[in-house]
Amino acid sequence: VRESFEDAWGVKLDAEPGHRIPNMFDEALSGGFKGLYCQGEDIAQSDPNTRHVEAALESMECLIVQDIFLNETAKFAHVFLPGSSFLEKDGTFTNAERRISRVRKAMEPLGGKADWEATLGLAQALGCDWDYENPEQIMAEIAALTPSFAGVTYEKIERLGSVQWPCTDVVSEGTPTMHEDSFTRGLGQFVVTEYVPTVERCTRRFPLIMTTGRILSQYNVGAQTRRTENSTWHAEDVLEIHPADAESRGISDGDWVGIASRIG
């Protein structure tokens, strides 16, 4: 598989996996990670340790953000590219059920380009020899290089309505249920996970541990839903404290409080 990608792309793939997002931030602050192309993700809003994330974004020599909103990450961008919403996209969508379905745009992108077209233009500006003309060609390349997608075509998706990978020459119409008899390596492998305690500790100065949670009216960090009428259902964030902890600190329901931690 690696050789297929190297032949198709004309490059030598690194033998080791690349950095994960937290490692990117650490490397950026130490000077070893200088540029990031952030597409459809508001890492300044959603990732933990905000000060650390913002310092990393500020330290980069080139930060390109592509999104449908001028989000928190965009405030640090050197270049901002407009993204396209689901109503403006043409292509496929693969969900957590492994189901590949067609997506058809209802309107032209207000920013003038679909996401893939903006990515294509950036790649060409950087000297890449990319010549895709439509999303179907991109899916054809995925099918040519990814064994579990080898049998996926737009024609098949249109004919069947959707396809679940793996979809190969052997399983030409997809795989509704995987691992019916066994796993690829045989029987299931159970692993004992070693307990790793949290680094946070209650101290005399910081006697409570705080964690973030979810609210019904907002999806995840609310990158999209906070820009809708959903915000009228939950106009401001609240801090929830155990009644005993609140009483011992003289805090009543509805009071304003200040919050401080070891990192800010």
How should these model regions be labeled?
Residues 1-151, 209, 213-264:
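Non-catalytic alpha/beta scaffold blocks inside enzyme catalytic domains
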Residues 138-229:
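Long, low-complexity segments enriched in small/aliphatic residues
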